[in-house]
UniProtKB/Swiss-Prot annotation:
Name of the gene this protein is made from: aroQ
UniProt-listed Pfam families: DHquinase_II
SUPFAM superfamilies, per database record: Type II 3-dehydroquinate dehydratase (SSF52304)
The entry's keywords: Amino-acid biosynthesis, Aromatic amino acid biosynthesis, Lyase
Designated name of the protein: 3-dehydroquinate dehydratase
Record-listed E.C. numbers: 4.2.1.10
Enzyme class: lyase
Gene source species: Brucella canis (strain ATCC 23365 / NCTC 10854 / RM-666)
Amino acid sequence: MTKTVFVLNGPNLNLLGKREPGIYGVATLDDIEASCKREAGQLELQIDFRQSNHEGDLVSWIQEAGEKNAYVLINPAAYSHTSVAIHDAIRSARVTVVEVHLSNIHAREAFRHHSHVSAVAKGVICGFGAEGYLLGLRALAAIAKEEENNGQSIKGA
């Protein structure tokens, strides 16, 4: 059975490739989406790739993923550090989440060191640029395989 992964991207990620390439790299969000689609095909995953600058959209999509028993690979961007709403949506939806960041948030400004999402994520990948998305998909594929082998669903952290 093919598992669906919602790949959710938060604010300002639509500007990738133009916005601070020294921090976030030169890959655009379209480049990352194309790489994710290729990787997902090899991993026998289906992806639903989305981006919004609005917190409520991310909350609604997390809830939708929960209703569809899908996984979530999320780069909440700045909302990582501020959004209790996204934290609560993940907890309420009981969805398996991998959090990803292009930069190493722990090597940046102090206000970026804490993520509200990390506490409810299965795992966190940061600092590997666009490759982090592919690492996240591989992690979710491994979780899907484990669930299939065990005949159960592994939810949350």
